[in-house]
């Protein structure tokens, strides 16, 4: 009888822990209602993908994943300069976005997209 109680308790514990998903959820750009996510969708997603995952173009060029992996630009200033001035195939957004909007995108990339480094 004691064995059955222990078995039932063990099954209950296993079932209880199986109900919890321990994988952290990734920040979803497409579901976000923030202004920064809206800026990303309007200006960055066309090239970097709807979730910032990057992609390969038909001509073989690679648009980088800005969420994970190694990043060429890591500091706020480097990211700001790259968004504002473009380069390496990226168009400059100075004149398209305000200084404040570029800074908001920098914070969005650093705070929300790269927080799972």
Predicted features and spans:
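Electrostatic cytochrome c docking/interface patches
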Residues: 19-39, 55
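The canonical Cys-X-X-Cys-His
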Residues: 36, 40-50, 105, 109
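Short sequence/structural segments immediately N-terminal
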Residues: 32-41, 97, 111-117
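Disulfide-bonded cysteines in secreted/extracellular proteins and peptides
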Residues: 19, 44-47, 90
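Extracytoplasmic electron-transfer domains, predominantly the class I c-type cytochrome c fold
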Residues: 61-113
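A general structural signal marking secondary-structure boundaries and capping sites
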Residues: 23, 51, 87, 112-116
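Conserved catalytic-core motifs of eukaryotic protein kinase domains, centered on the activation segment
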Residues: 57-59
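Sec-dependent bacterial lipoprotein signal peptides
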Residues: 1-19
């Amino acid at each position: 009888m004691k064995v059955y109680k222990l078995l039932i308790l063990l099954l209950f514990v296993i079932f209880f822990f199986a109900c919890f998903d321990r994988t952290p959820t990734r920040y979803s750009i497409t579901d976000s209602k923030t202004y920064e996510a809206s800026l990303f969708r309007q200006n960055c997603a066309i090239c970097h993908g709807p979730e910032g995952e990057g992609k390969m173009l038909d001509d073989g060029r690679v648009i980088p994943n800005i969420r994970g992996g190694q990043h060429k630009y890591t500091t706020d200033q480097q990211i700001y300069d790259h968004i504002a001035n473009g380069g390496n195939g990226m168009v400059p957004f100075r004149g398209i976005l305000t200084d404040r909007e570029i800074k908001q995108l920098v914070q969005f990339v650093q705070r929300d997209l790269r927080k799972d480094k």
